[in-house]
């Protein structure tokens, strides 16, 4: 999640503390079992597994994930992503908008999770999702990763120059590649319009534009441009009845798909949104 896959050891241990607090105080499920190791021990364990390496530095040791370990670490992340997907979505929402009405946060979380539910096998119903979100927000407030501004009923990010703001952004980074894939797919559908693309054509367009994004911008997670991930998401959209495939093979949709698209814009940086929109326009004109 960090630039160049490298982190200051102290900062890394702080992030581990945040994850452990979320796992303990707002667990994904009652059966969730947290890690009994403290953050320093977790880092040491990862070193022994050789999935990270240490660089000694007078200003503080750096911990880095070697390039050759990136596919393995992506696999590790994807295996546990459902556990922290909801905190990550909330972190993305607030860190990229600075100050949001709490009701808007709840609405956006519900819309985004409706798209992620099948892909990540998320367990919550509508009411359960609201309760889980509130529990997570309480933990993030207690850890100063969120704050209540003066206006009642709003949520705000920490000050941009603070360490807490950096940590909130890092928390959101875990879900960013998935959200970017979703936004690219929805933006392409919106660009072409209902009833103009077949499923294979949409998969090909997503794959081709994702490859280009990976080369031009910082869309550099190993699995971001993989065609199979887009194919799976499009299949989930059809199963969830966000898309309807007619006998002639064309994909149709209505405002039920455009509403999550609007919500998805809230969780990405301006740079990511603009890059994806530009590529979607280019793909639509091709």
Predicted features and spans:
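Membrane-interfacial terminal anchoring regions of lipid-handling membrane enzymes
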Residues: 1-286
């Amino acid at each position: 999640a960090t630039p160049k896959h490298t982190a200051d050891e102290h900062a890394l241990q702080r992030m581990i503390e945040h994850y452990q607090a979320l796992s303990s105080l707002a667990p994904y499920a009652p059966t969730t079992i947290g890690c009994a190791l403290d953050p320093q021990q977790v880092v040491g364990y990862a070193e022994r597994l050789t999935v990270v390496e240490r660089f000694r530095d007078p200003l503080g040791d750096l911990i880095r994930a070697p390039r050759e370990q990136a596919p393995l670490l992506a696999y590790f992340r994807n295996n546990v992503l459902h556990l922290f997907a909801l905190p990550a979505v909330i972190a993305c929402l607030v860190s990229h908008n600075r100050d949001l009405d709490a009701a808007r946060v709840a609405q956006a979380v519900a819309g985004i999770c409706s798209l992620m539910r099948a892909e990540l096998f998320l367990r919550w119903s509508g009411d359960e999702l609201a309760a889980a979100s509130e529990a997570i927000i309480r933990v993030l407030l207690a850890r100063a990763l969120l704050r209540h501004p003066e206006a009642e009923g709003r949520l705000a990010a920490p000050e941009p120059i603070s360490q807490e703001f950096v940590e909130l952004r890092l928390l959101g980074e875990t879900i960013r590649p998935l959200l970017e894939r979703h936004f690219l797919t929805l933006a392409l559908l919106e660009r072409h319009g209902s009833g103009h693309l077949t499923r294979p054509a949409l998969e090909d367009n997503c794959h081709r534009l994702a490859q280009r994004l990976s080369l031009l911008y910082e869309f550099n997670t190993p699995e971001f441009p993989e065609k199979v991930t887009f194919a799976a998401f499009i299949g989930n959209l059809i199963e969830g009845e966000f898309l309807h495939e007619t006998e002639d093979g064309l994909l149709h949709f209505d405002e039920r798909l455009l509403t999550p698209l609007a919500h998805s814009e809230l969780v990405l940086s301006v740079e990511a949104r603009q890059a994806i929109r530009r590529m979607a326009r280019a793909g639509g004109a091709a």
